[in-house]
Swiss-Prot record:
The gene is clpP. Keywords: Cytoplasm, Hydrolase, Protease, Serine protease. Belongs to the peptidase S14 family. This is ATP-dependent Clp protease proteolytic subunit. GO terms for biological process: protein quality control for misfolded or incompletely synthesized proteins. It comes from Streptococcus agalactiae serotype V (strain ATCC BAA-611 / 2603 V/R).
Length: 196
């Protein structure tokens, strides 16, 4: 169930679903699994807000366990394509593809709530049953290219070397807000609407 907000206007009452009301304040909620439908919705909202006024920031609240690499990279590419700065605020968690998205916010405007978590790891893939050996080799090569692409983005976003990111992402690596700040993925920890 999506909550409805009722506003008083000069013409009377107007009701919005909560996400439409937040969008009026340039707030986008990226929550749940990153997949094509969700990515299309996020991209459409980014493009709409940028077309509306590209001099104002967009606020992207992130709480995701990750998901599809291609869907996530489409969001990141759009964030980089538009003129508006995209502030990212991690609440709950940014894991896997979520770290790529959250760390791709405008430099100096990447935030995290104090009890949120970050997790980086290498990308996962599979070929399914009954796959030919040559197809498995192609899939393995593609997975290695994808891993390099993601590690380069994380290195660029954090200021760490690709080698360090590669080593740290070998297995699931969970980080607290302070550890995420120290690593360079965020610029500040937000507490009570104040920055630390």
């Amino acid at each position: 169930m999506i909550p409805v907000v009722i506003e008083q206007t000069s013409r009377g009452e107007r009701s919005y679903d909560i996400y439409s009301r937040l969008l009026k304040d340039r707030i986008i909620m990226l929550t749940g699994q990153v997949e094509d439908n969700m990515a299309n919705s996020i991209i459409a909202q980014l493009l709409f807000l940028d077309a509306q006024d590209n001099t104002k920031d967009i606020y992207l609240y992130v709480n995701t366990p990750g998901g599809s690499v291609s869907a996530g990279l489409a969001i990141v590419d759009t964030m980089n394509f538009i003129k508006s700065d995209v502030q990212t605020i991690v609440m709950g968690m940014a894991a896997s593809m979520g770290t790529i998205i959250a760390s791709s916010g405008a430099k100096g405007k990447r935030f995290m709530l104090p009890n949120a978590e970050y997790m980086i790891h290498q990308p996962m893939g599979g070929t399914g049953g009954g796959t030919q050996q040559s197809d498995m080799a192609i899939a393995a090569e593609h997975l290695l290219k994808t891993r390099h692409t993601l590690e380069k983005i994380l290195a660029d976003n954090s200021g760490q070397s690709i080698e360090k990111v590669h080593d740290d992402a070998e297995r699931d690596r969970w980080m607290s807000a302070q550890e995420t700040l120290d690593y360079g993925f965020i610029d500040a920890i937000m507490e009570n609407n104040n920055l630390q």
